[in-house]
Swiss-Prot record:
Belongs to the imidazoleglycerol-phosphate dehydratase family. This is Imidazoleglycerol-phosphate dehydratase. The gene is hisB. It is an enzyme of class 4 (lyase). InterPro entries: IGPD_sf, ImidazoleglycerolP_deHydtase, ImidazoleglycerP_deHydtase_CS, Ribosomal_Su5_D2-typ_SF.
């Protein structure tokens, strides 16, 4: 079974279109009005070893909040749909990723209980058109809509760019590992995820 999804989410504020194939490493095309966010999405999807297209239009361009949140929601829904009943997936993963002085831990469980616990000390208030307060919000919206329990903790570092990028790399690597097929079982004592 192909593990991919095409999701379109349109509101009065944004229009988001996501195509995601979690089993085929290929081209990644990202188009949002937030340059640094584009960089982080490319990073996330590259480390997931995926093929993806993300197109985001901001109908009310007040600030970056709606784009960040709505892309997170739509990408989360795409991962959830692509995983189907989650049969055979490894389910759990953790990664500790350095980027120069920054060190970030990501631990996740594809549990169908979406929640995020994010502990990052982001010293800059904005980077590349992105308000850094929206980084934890991205992870929370993504986790809730993908059904992933997600923990992200900064272990060291002071450069905001490095801390954020290490977080997206670690999340991508953890998602790649947790979504790998390891057998034909549902990895849960309940028999469902």
């Amino acid at each position: 079974m192909a593990r991919n999804a095409n999701i379109t989410r349109e509101t009065k504020e944004t229009k988001i279109e996501v195509f995601l194939d979690i089993d085929r490493k290929g081209e990644i095309k990202i188009s949002t009005p937030v340059p640094f966010f584009n960089h982080m999405l490319i990073t996330l999807l590259t480390y997931m070893n995926s093929t993806a297209t993300v197109s985001a239009t901001d109908k009310l361009p007040y600030d970056d909040h709606h784009i960040i949140e709505d892309v997170a929601i739509t990408l989360g829904l795409a991962i959830k749909e692509a995983l189907g009943d989650k049969r055979g997936i490894k389910r759990f993963s953790h990664q500790i990723i350095p980027m120069d002085e920054a060190l970030v831990l990501v631990s996740l469980d594809i549990s169908n209980r979406g929640m995020a616990f994010v502990s990052l000390n982001l010293r800059r208030s904005e980077i590349g058109g992105l308000a850094t307060e929206n980084i934890p919000h991205f992870f929370q919206s993504f986790a809730y809509n993908s059904g992933v329990t997600l923990h992200i903790s900064q272990l060291s570092g002071y450069n905001t760019h490095h801390i954020i990028e290490a977080s997206f790399k670690a999340l991508g690597l953890a998602l790649y590992e947790a979504t790998r097929i390891v057998d034909n079982e549902i990895r849960s004592t309940k028999g469902v995820i």
